Amino acid sequence: MSESLHLTRNGPILEITLDRPKANAIDAKTSFAMGEAFLNFRDDPELRVAIITGGGEKFFSAGWDLKAAAEGEAPDADFGPGGFAGLTEIFDLDKPVIAAVNGYAFGGGFELALAADFIVCAENASFALPEAKLGIVPDSGGVLRLPKLLPPAIVNEMVMTGRRMSAEEALRWGVVNRVVSQSELMESARELAQQLVNSAPLAIAALKEIYRATSEMPVEEGYRYIRSGVLKHYPSVLHSEDALEGPQAFAEKRAPVWKGR
């Protein structure tokens, strides 16, 4: 594993810390390491939730390492499994990822956060896609994911001028889930992670699968699709031991014990 990436396992929760002073920028080597970490998380049956954060209190990530770019790393370089930052192109990850944004999330750093399922950010966090000012475009998900969250006028301003969005504005628009103080950031992310662990893993996997498959469909078409039998996790949930355990635990006034089957 890269020395720029620190992994910590807390039971079923994996914490990934990007630590590349001064701005936690990501070059191809670091991106490969991040992809390996996320794929291992995906494939490890003991892990349920991942938290990605940045080292320090100023930068979550400034995105692509422009020093590496100046030294010849191309914008379309091979950034490894999972695409840039290891997460932006993993489309079969059925476990939740929380981005704990501790500071500036610019360019690919913002795209990394957008690829997560939840964003918890510190009050000093801000978000921007300044690629157009550098002669490139935010093609690691920024131009694809941001329009699903914001009105076109706001998206156009952000991607064409590089305008920054504060943590509070991001909360108002629903881009982030929570805004907390810097000192409370990881505590808040871990609290959310534990809430996710308390939910049934198969149900979480089915929800992510359904979201991916039906997000662009009309509601009626979505109903037909999820009942067509083509999905992997949804039918499994209906006939799982966990589907029996949930109501049984509720009736017995105890916490459910999920088996993931």
From Swiss-Prot:
Broad class of enzyme this protein falls into: lyase
Recorded metabolic or biological pathway in which this protein acts: Amine and polyamine metabolism; carnitine metabolism
EC number: 4.2.1.149
GO molecular function: hydro-lyase activity; L-carnitine CoA-transferase activity
Catalytic machinery residues: 111 (nucleophile), 131 (proton acceptor)
Annotated InterPro entries: Carnitinyl_CoA_dehydratase, ClpP/crotonase-like_dom_sf, Enoyl-CoA_hyd/isom_CS, Enoyl-CoA_hydra/iso, Enoyl-CoA_hydra_C
Coiled coil: none
BP-aspect Gene Ontology terms: carnitine metabolic process; fatty acid beta-oxidation
Keywords of the record: Lyase
Reactions it catalyzes: (R)-carnitinyl-CoA = crotonobetainyl-CoA + H2O
Function per UniProt: Catalyzes the reversible dehydration of L-carnitinyl-CoA to crotonobetainyl-CoA.
Similarity-based family: Belongs to the enoyl-CoA hydratase/isomerase family.
Protein name: Carnitinyl-CoA dehydratase
